[in-house]
Amino acid sequence: LIHNWENLKDDLILFLGAGASVGSINESGYSLPNAYELRNQIWSRFILHPSERDAYDFSNLSLMSLEHASTLAEIKSSRRNLELFLAEKFQIQKSLWQHGMLPFLNTKSIFTTNYDNLIEKGFHTVNYGKPLNSIFNNTTSLNSRFIPLYKPHGTIDYPHSKVSEGGFVITQFDYYEIMDTRQKMLESFISDFQNKCVIFIGYSLLDFDIASILYNMARKNKTQCWYAVFPRNDSDVRNMLRDK
């Protein structure tokens, strides 16, 4: 990427996953949780009796997904309590230094599945280049004066909004509700991929509907290199993705 920078710098698209938020601290002084940590915290808070929490073995949950645990939590408690809990977990005061560098990349657009507003705070801190325009559904009009920030899973800035208007997409039913909207948003986002360099930062590609669209786009788009940065950058992962 560094050696090819002069050829790519004017055609960048960023795709940020949970790994891009590693190192961030919330207002309670704790690291932002990853998916499995958040699942365990939701299970402890809403499902377990207080007397069970200290000794509970979360391996009992096996491969239970975050959205499944969240669905049960919403049923047992309430949607608002779940939203308040998530807001507390992802409320931050400042972004990391690397988020403050994002505006200087002059990216064409940004896509993130993260709830936090580290990207927004990074742009606000340095006040450089085009401002962001957050997009939560496929009805928002694009404006060349702004950098589109696609956030299909919602944001900490609108914790109590509808899921298609910035609210948290966290339960199984939330995902069902936005399935069509997210598909159209993805199509809008990837329509700009042709001849662009896509950089994935901390994105695991475990979301199969997103990953499948990206995979097919990558096979068609042979004119630019795509790059991926992962917290766990081992040789097996690198070799698996290199030719895909």
Pin down the residues of each PLM region.
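Conserved catalytic-core helix/loop/strand module for nucleotide-ribose chemistry
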Residues: 1-197, 201-244
